[in-house]
């Protein structure tokens, strides 16, 4: 690292003429600075409370990738909005001008715990609390690693910058611009800190597959020795965080991981958990972080006099969040690494009540369901609508996948085959009927089924083939009511189940048409079947 990079984090070399550079400030300094500047307040227990204003979630429609010779054939343009190199040039010039003479906070951090595949990143912020946030979320170098630190990507986040759609080729005053050739991400016009976290994820999702490393939107746990690992894929609301938090196992991470020849590794060093209506009974470890010094609470309502938090109040945001280091969780991994997985779990919250509580997948079925990324959400009740809606988010994280999903799917299939991993589909949604008539799958049953899968005993169970989806469903499992293992038997109206199952199968088939041309015939053959019912049925 050059002398200038040691002094200013390499900003001058980027053409940034900052007034003051606060390089690698630690948590106490950033805490104090955020409060003194009026960016944040301290809650009872010591957490830092901040408000992000108009933006309380990601601005997905304001994210753009530079379309140039490097990215033209690498990026999945059906899913990623493009910006021209000329528009990005104008944006970069205006960002440089906006930073001139300003006080900036710079963190030199690693994305990834695998020493062979981690990414050194430079994160530039104008807000002290943003600098604290990303210091929690990424991995802080050891003291001796700073001397040789050379950032390979730069992320600059300036909430006070307002983009000009005509000049910058964007959609609004908010912009997230990614230039893979120049290795720069520019974030402007939003204070929502999750944009920085997900920018790092997007970068790694682009870079790692070229190295044969699989990036994943998932949680991971292992046994205390770092072996017998399990990957949990799942969209929001499927139970990914809850089910991977197991007191008898080590939590490697809750959101973003890679799978390399060395095993599994966390991209992050912290967690970014949903706080709304968080329960001390249901999730005690996460709830405890709300009363911890160091935690950054985003859009959590606090009494201005008593400084007591109200986690049930959604007046600032439904998407209230807490950022804290992984070390705040008692059974978290110190290294962020573990061995190769023994099991892959794909979680779905099926509000239609069709999916079994657990099913075993072949490698082809695993790739099919990974590319489908299915869950079902319950519609809002503001107009009295209670009909569930199907959600398909490919790779269980479509907004963060720059490459074509088939590229990630093929890599996952190869790794599953190489390491002989068992794959399971787990439904945490409804049984005995759809949402409104059925009941939520008992979490006790889900945990018992997961434990049987993870300890290997489920492999010796008797299975039946599901007539709609073709996967194998256990007939009996110790500690689980056998009736819930057959979803059709739990419905009082069997004809209604058959009709709904056919509709869901059709949704899968329609959704997968996007990927059919990009996958092998045996993966296409893993699709569900819309079957003709016999008179007996």
Curated annotation (Swiss-Prot):
EC identifiers of the protein: 4.1.1.49
Cofactor comment text: Binds 1 Mn(2+) ion per subunit.
Molecular-function annotations in GO: ATP binding; metal ion binding; phosphoenolpyruvate carboxykinase (ATP) activity
Keywords: ATP-binding, Cytoplasm, Decarboxylase, Gluconeogenesis, Lyase, Manganese, Metal-binding, Nucleotide-binding
InterPro entries with a match to the protein in the record: PEP_carboxykinase_ATP, PEP_carboxykinase_C, PEP_carboxykinase_N
Domain of life according to the entry: Bacteria
Any single biological process term in GO: gluconeogenesis
Gene3D superfamilies, A to Z: 3.90.228.20, Phosphoenolpyruvate Carboxykinase, domain 1, Phosphoenolpyruvate Carboxykinase, domain 2
Cellular compartment(s): Cytoplasm
Entry-linked Pfam families: PEPCK_ATP (PF01293)
Residues noted as binding Mn(2+) in the record, renumbered to the chain: 198, 217, 255
This protein's GO CC annotations: cytosol
Cofactors (names): Mn(2+)
Catalyses which reaction(s): oxaloacetate + ATP = phosphoenolpyruvate + ADP + CO2
Family: Belongs to the phosphoenolpyruvate carboxykinase (ATP) family.
PANTHER family documented for this protein: PHOSPHOENOLPYRUVATE CARBOXYKINASE (ATP), PHOSPHOENOLPYRUVATE CARBOXYKINASE ATP
Biological role stated in the UniProt entry: Involved in the gluconeogenesis. Catalyzes the conversion of oxaloacetate (OAA) to phosphoenolpyruvate (PEP) through direct phosphoryl transfer between the nucleoside triphosphate and OAA.
Name of the protein described by the UniProt record: Phosphoenolpyruvate carboxykinase (ATP)
The organism of origin for this protein: Maricaulis maris (strain MCS10)
Source taxonomy: Bacteria, Pseudomonadati, Pseudomonadota, Alphaproteobacteria, Maricaulales
